[in-house]
Amino acid sequence: MNPKLRSILFWIHLICGLIVGLVVGVMSFTGAAIAFESQIIEWADRDARHVTPPAEGAPKLTLEEMLAKVKEAKPAVPPSGVTVYPGAESVVSVALGRGATVYVNPYTGEVREPGAQGWRSFFHTMEDLHRWLAASGDNRAVGKAITGVANLAFLFLGLTGLFLWWPRKWNLRAMRPILWFRRGLKGKARDFNWHNVIGFWSLPVLVVLTTSGAVISYKWASNLVFTLTGNEPPAAQGPMAAAPVVVPTPAPGTQPQPLDAQFAAVMKQSNAWETITLRLATPPGAGAPGGRPEGAPRGEGGQRGEGAQRGEVGPRGEGGPRGEGRAEGRGGPKGPQASAFTVREQERWPLFANNTVSLDPFTAQTLKTETYADFNSGRKVRTWLRFLHTGEALGWVGQLIAALASFGAVFLVYTGYALSWRRFVPRRKTQAVAPPAPVAPPAETNINAA
């Protein structure tokens, strides 16, 4: 590389890193902290989600009865979603508003609070820091803007860092110090070695994380995915591009089918399933205050989706990875709304894929079934980017890789600041004062008189 160009890139890289380094460090640390949120919550919630049937083949309450129990126990916030599981020893999960969940014993109607409140509070704090630096109210938009710009700057730092890393000579002696850790180094040499090695090995993952983060943060980036794949961008930010499902107008006085009948119709046409979720109509403004938007994935403030519910229409862990679609009634702007169910099957690919089944609520007849295969190419790529951002697209292995790369980014911030400090604030070298040279005693003069 031309030395002059290299010098220009170096100073741009350094100044940009100094400006956004702290924000990048916070985002990287919190990203690593919430990497395995779903598995930890599932483990901590294991007792709260388990029930003992009173007898083999004991009848369950109807879903309407369970919802009535929830409304009685939680009158302030209306139910917004219901998730059922196939096991006889499983609870029914009921979402409240936009950020809370309770479990219902299907045999007794007992309403339980989720366990792991400490873990939930911790992850909620980490996500708020990750997405908008824990800002609240009107300042949340400012925090989100700062993290969005810092994410783009981090992508730029990664690319310029690769140019600066590029060895002048491609031989083992020149490349070894920038490809692997060296023992016995201290101070500037150690930080330089760490910065180069960690940056090189984590760069591919960090490019994916920052690129996908930009697509999540910015509508123009999300639209670009659809444009590059030759598809019309959806009106709303995110991958949701399905048209409303039209429900035939029923005869006057016709009542909707019971929820159990609607769930049974969906179960009948589904393969071995893990969860089935129905989002209920919620009055405007009924969301739980302060709750994370229903299904809003990390870094994305929109709907959750194609897949499951991270914000707990179904508790994470039962529903699998955070999704981007919504299980909710959908129809035309006027007229009856379709009952839209999100089905997570056991045998699925990609791992985040869900099926959406839209029913006529008055007849329980299927109006439309949409699977991942039905998505256009833009929506497929957009959804992959959403789950690559958390690593969930590749299961726990992907989550581990994303966590390690995020943790590596924390060290990049540390070593970057340490190298900058040594550059701008050099250590004062104390010069040892040489002891004064010993003074020779005066020579004796002997005068011998003759």
Question: Which ranges hold each PLM region?
Answer:
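Conserved histidines in hydrophobic membrane contexts and catalytic metal-binding motifs
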Residues: 1-450
